[in-house]
């Protein structure tokens, strides 16, 4: 990391030194043209890169005026496969057409793990020092110094190690296979809180182990107590094939639910719990057949789950544990009607008959207001400076005009060392165009966004993870929750209009104690978030460039503008870390929730209930 950091520090965006030669990468959508000699190239001599960048930006701008997508013609990748790919065949036994031979059982009130399978263990846990299965980094021990605030009645004492009790013994075996040595701060508290039967609202900095924070205690309690009796079926025989999960995890995007499912497979390995995943954009018939084979822990995107409930394929009558991950993003994306339909209108046990856990890196007041309907006597857990960034991330803000962004990015990539680089842009067409430019400059890159098919997105993510294409250009679809090992550099090519999105984007690096670098291209078009950006840098003890201070002073003449400010409740971002029950005054009326649906970036909330539409989020 020091090599990369030194390279970035010494980077001169006006440097005319030619980049080192790279092997030509030909993506599948260009393979035919390359074979026939009809491929196009936008390459320019390295010693005139800045002028070439301006020309490319001009082409990019014109493509919008002409309603053209640019030269990026199609989706990347031709199918599922590869290590850990989400193939619909035999995926370690969990998706096969037969019972996984390593699956455990629950007999006479006791959990009986299944036999070990070395091939499955290598597939889902990797081997020691496998870079694709990154765990903790050199700064992980610093997490012990992070302040933790837990508020509520009778807060259980935190744990300091993975032990039994409170964790079930077989879960400890799987945690050891995953090479997790000690709990993160959020896990130290969440495990005893859930074991005590309490509800939880947990806020923790991104990369702090939130997924383990809910999977560990939920699976542990499931292993201890076993499955619930399945209700006796009634009605036609063909309606009997219905899943009755005991745990439900809701998350906003396909990528995040897929990632949580992959983690659930690890920690449910050889247990009686069979995890399943459902999300839009994939074959619903295959998903229905999969859950019919047994589903004890269901990870789901809200829209697809509503569809399966309506089809009579999933019942929520047996739910003991409900987890809402990235709850603020689900509301921003307009999922509140679906979430309320799932929790309050689908036969799920009421708030007093289940445990409910809400996890996210930010919990603004409108989400805490939602908690009064979904949680009972909950514990509010704030780990570190929630809504801020990790000091493991070195943040650099460069002043770059729009017309110079391409050349600036090319210079950064030329100086980059080993590791993965994630580049964020604001638009889908912008992602495709920039990816095409990078490929024409011999940088192996791919892209993901909401218009890509699920097959193409999974393939692109897999090739990014394994380093085949170490540069990924992404829109906000990849910004929240994804845990991709070895992302050493995040570039905000286009800064978002919401500072929380910035926090989540750069949180793709510097995870679990590892270090990373985040570079942002800033100009006066981003003055709406300049004050909050300065606050973020100061909170993480980063350098604040003079041009940010100057822009902030200029913006002050126009009043205290800025981004969304998380609902404008009057305290800005810092108040999103607090338990509003301590402040008194109540939460107001339920009618306030009507304004939460349909964030400005995602359209109206009602569109997410239309399963027949061309919707990329459910």
Swiss-Prot record:
ATP binds at residues 204-211. InterPro entries: DEAD/DEAH_box_helicase_dom, Helicase_ATP-bd, Helicase_C-like, P-loop_NTPase, RNA-helicase_DEAD-box_CS, RNA_helicase_DEAD_Q_motif. The keyword Cell cycle does not apply. Residues 55-70 have a biased composition (Low complexity). Gene3D superfamilies: P-loop containing nucleotide triphosphate hydrolases. Residues 1-116, 552-618 are annotated as: Disordered. Its EC number is 3.6.4.13. This is ATP-dependent RNA helicase DED1. It comes from the Eukaryota. GO terms for cellular component: cytoplasm; nucleus; spliceosomal complex. It is found in: Cytoplasm. Its main location: cytoplasm. CDD domains: SF2_C_DEAD.
């Amino acid at each position: 990391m020091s090599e990369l950091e030194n390279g970035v520090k010494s980077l001169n965006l006006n440097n005319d030194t030619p980049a080192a030669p790279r092997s030509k990468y030909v993506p599948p959508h260009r393979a035919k043209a390359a074979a026939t000699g009809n491929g196009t190239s936008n390459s320019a001599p390295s010693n005139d890169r800045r002028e070439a960048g301006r020309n490319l930006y001009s082409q990019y701008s014109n493509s919008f005026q002409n309603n053209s997508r640019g030269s990026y013609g199609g989706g990347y990748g031709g199918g599922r496969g590869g290590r850990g790919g989400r193939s619909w065949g035999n995926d370690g036994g969990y998706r096969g057409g037969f019972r996984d031979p390593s699956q455990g059982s629950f007999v006479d009130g006791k959990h009986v793990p299944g036999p070990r399978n070395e091939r499955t263990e290598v597939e889902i846990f990797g081997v020691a020092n496998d870079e694709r299965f990154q765990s903790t980094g050199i700064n992980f021990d610093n997490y012990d110094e992070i302040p933790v605030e837990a508020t509520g009645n009778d807060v259980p004492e935190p744990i300091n190690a993975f032990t039994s009790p409170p964790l079930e013994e077989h879960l400890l075996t799987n945690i050891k296979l995953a090479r997790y040595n000690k709990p993160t701060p959020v896990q130290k508290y969440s495990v005893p809180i859930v074991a005590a039967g309490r509800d939880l609202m947990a806020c923790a900095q991104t990369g702090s182990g939130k997924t383990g924070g809910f999977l560990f205690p939920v699976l542990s309690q499931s292993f201890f107590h076993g499955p619930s009796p399945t209700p006796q079926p009634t009605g036609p025989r063909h309606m009997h094939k219905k899943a009755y999960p005991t745990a439900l995890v809701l998350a906003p995007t396909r990528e995040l639910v897929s990632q949580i499912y992959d983690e659930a497979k690890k920690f449910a390995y050889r247990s009686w719990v069979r995890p399943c995943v459902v999300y839009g954009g994939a074959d619903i018939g295959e998903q229905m057949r999969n859950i019919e084979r047994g589903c004890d822990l269901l990870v789901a995107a809200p829209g697809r789950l509503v569809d399966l409930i309506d089809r009579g394929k999933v019942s929520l009558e047996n739910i003991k544990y409900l987890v809402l991950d990235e709850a603020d993003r689900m509301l921003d994306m307009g999922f509140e009607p679906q979430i309320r339909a799932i929790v309050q209108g689908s036969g799920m046990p009421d708030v007093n008959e289940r445990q409910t856990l809400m996890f996210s890196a930010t919990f603004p007041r409108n989400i805490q207001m939602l908690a009064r309907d979904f949680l009972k006597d909950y514990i509010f857990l704030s780990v570190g400076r929630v809504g801020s960034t990790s000091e493991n991330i070195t943040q650099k803000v460069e002043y770059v005009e729009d017309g110079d962004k391409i050349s600036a990015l090319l210079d950064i990539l030329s100086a980059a060392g080993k590791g993965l680089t994630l580049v964020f842009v604001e638009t889908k067409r912008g992602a495709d165009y920039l990816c095409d430019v990078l490929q024409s400059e011999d940088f192996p890159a791919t892209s993901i966004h909401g218009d890509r098919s699920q097959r193409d997105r999974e393939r692109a993510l897999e090739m990014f993870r394994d380093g085949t294409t170490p540069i990924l250009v992404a829109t906000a679809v990849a910004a929240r929750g994804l845990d991709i090992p070895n992302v050493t550099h995040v570039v905000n090519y286009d800064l978002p209009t919401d500072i929380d999105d910035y926090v989540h984007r750069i949180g793709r690096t510097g995870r679990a104690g590892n270090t990373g670098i985040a570079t942002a291209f800033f100009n006066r078009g981003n003055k709406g978030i300049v004050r909050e950006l300065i606050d973020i840098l100061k909170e993480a003890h980063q350098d604040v460039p003079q041009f940010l201070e100057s822009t902030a002073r200029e913006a002050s003449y126009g009043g205290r503008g800025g981004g969304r400010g998380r609902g404008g409740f009057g305290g800005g971002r810092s108040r999103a870390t607090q338990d509003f029950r301590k402040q008194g005054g109540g939460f107001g009326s339920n009618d306030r929730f009507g304004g939460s649906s349909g964030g400005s970036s995602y359209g109206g909330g009602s569109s997410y209930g239309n399963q027949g539409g061309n919707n990329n989020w459910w």
